[in-house]
Amino acid sequence: MAAAASGAGAGAAQEKQFPPALLSFFIYNPRFGPREGEEENKILFYYPNEVEKNEKIRNVGLCEAIVQFTRTFSPSKPAKSLHTQKNRQFFNEPEENFWMVMVVRNPIIEKQSKDGKPVVEYQEEELLDKVYSSVLQQCYSMYKLFNGTFLRAMEDGGVKLLKERLEKFFHRYLQTLHLQSCDLLDIFGGISFFPLDKMTYLKIQSFINRMEESLSIVKYTAFLYNDQLIWSGLEQDDMRILYKYLTTSLFPRHIEPELAGRDSPIRAEMPGNLQHYGRFLTGPLNLNDPEAKCRFPKIFVNTDDTYEALHLIVYKAMSAAVCFMIDASIQPTLDFCRRLDSIVGPQLTVLASDICEQFNINKRMSGSEKEPQFKFIYFNHMNLAEKSTVHMRKTPSVSLTSVHPDLMKILGDINSDFTRVDEDEEIIVKAMSDYWVVGKKSDQRELYVILNQKNANLIEVNEEVKKLCATQFNNIFFLD
């Protein structure tokens, strides 16, 4: 349990804050143990595993009862969450009769009473349902990306195989959940796109076409620069979850000092090879080692339709990364990897350098303004484009936001209001800290702005937001 001292004044040292924490996470299917004495068969995965068997059965039984009870009132949409003083339970049925449940402990403030005994206060209203329901859905999407559906595991090897896959995946994945840093971006699950001029975009398009022609077994390609997406041949929903995996898991594991020029040591091991910075992030570590293993992660896409299994090859040069996806029935050889390296490496290095140069020119032209008076989050539901100046960096372990958590909660509350109505609308809130928070929903797009202008009035705030829309989103139509 991590605690942080907070507060001001005399009692500050006595007050401790504990962020939300994962208490339990389980997956069950009520059809697998319908008779008395067979209840344990329903449980497919349970964390923490040390929990005594009868308690597991009791907790799953309680969830079943809650779902059944809420079905009475809403047959098509049963329980999504249950609020109690100490925790919040979230329910998700991603496939028929397969239920996932996540129990999160509410944040705690521990104070010292007059007689010196600790008094625990649960912050019942701090957690946002939509944020943690989205986190639970992400858990399933990430499992499905690397393992396929629950049903497919049942078809391939019955309950035994499904349990093995769930254990193997979630045992590791749950350790990467950092519930204290989840926020509005988890609801959107969007993709940050890299801003590019037409000429450079065409160069990238032409590079992808050349690569797909040279490496004919490549089925899909995705191109990223600086952890932002430029091009993808995958369906949106598949790219969205692959993007999350790349930016929060794979890339952070391979962080390298950005190459500032061409003065770093250049790889030129292979005779006649053009000098380049390319390397595999998945697959063989050393292409010169004849024993090198060419194992690539397997991913599953289009699971509702054609159900494709693919090998994921991620290759990087400087800040540019390309994902090549090939049919899983084809096993890439070391020769193929060497060929890919010799074709892609030099061209990707030059391209990465071009993008960097172009980006710096554009940056200089737009001029580095002083710290603006506002921060914003933008999301487009149609193409999943997301942009945030609120987040300095979103890493797997921490979401570094440059604003107070109270303001992040207001953003979440505004988003919940937007969900309840279909019409376009605007909400303006003045926070206790004198910040102004504005939410705009217009034509499948959402914009959230935080303004640091204590003495501004409503009209002035409205004008500021209009100015922001004109400068940052000049080609996007926002209804007034």
UniProtKB/Swiss-Prot annotation:
Keywords: Acetylation, Guanine-nucleotide releasing factor, Lysosome, Membrane, Phosphoprotein. The keyword Phosphoprotein applies. Signal peptide: none annotated. Pfam families: Intu_longin_1, Intu_longin_2, Intu_longin_3. The keyword Acetylation applies. It is found in: Lysosome membrane. Transmembrane segments: none annotated. GO terms for molecular function: guanyl-nucleotide exchange factor activity. The modification N-acetylalanine is found at residue 2. GO terms for cellular component: intracellular membrane-bounded organelle; lysosomal membrane; Mon1-Ccz1 complex. InterPro entries: Ccz1, CCZ1/INTU/HSP4_longin_1, CCZ1/INTU/HSP4_longin_3, CCZ1/INTU_longin_2. Belongs to the CCZ1 family. Acts in concert with MON1A, as a guanine exchange factor (GEF) for RAB7, promotes the exchange of GDP to GTP, converting it from an inactive GDP-bound form into an active GTP-bound form. This is Vacuolar fusion protein CCZ1 homolog. It comes from Bos taurus (Bovine).
